[in-house]
């Protein structure tokens, strides 16, 4: 088991898919949306569509902390299409840190946010093994490709011969895609 091999503290939650569908239907009905009859493709993929400048980053950060409180999730990857957006998300987290600490620290939630870089790929070990909420911001290009083109897919001596992507996989992170339409 990869989770045990890397010593990962990962997300773990077993929910009945019928319960998830019922919750989705309640949310859709409450918001005047078309109510789904089934989970699309049986997957647990959910979209929140918001116009630029309407607080998207705040909404998904707040969602991260609510998932941490309600379900004890601690691993989150924010996947973005460009370095500029990655830096913008990092800045937003830094600027909103005190706000989120005021809201969630009383509930026992502390968090770390970091940017993935191939230059410091070994930092995924800290992400994987920490018991705090971990938010890792990375570009889609940092994971596209293979061992010939991306460090994340290369085995590393400092990671016990594993690849950085193995550490991320072991945590079963919630992946939030910011501007997915720009990642194709």
Spans of features found by a protein language model:
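RecA-like P-loop NTPase motor core of helicase/translocase proteins
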Residues: 1-184
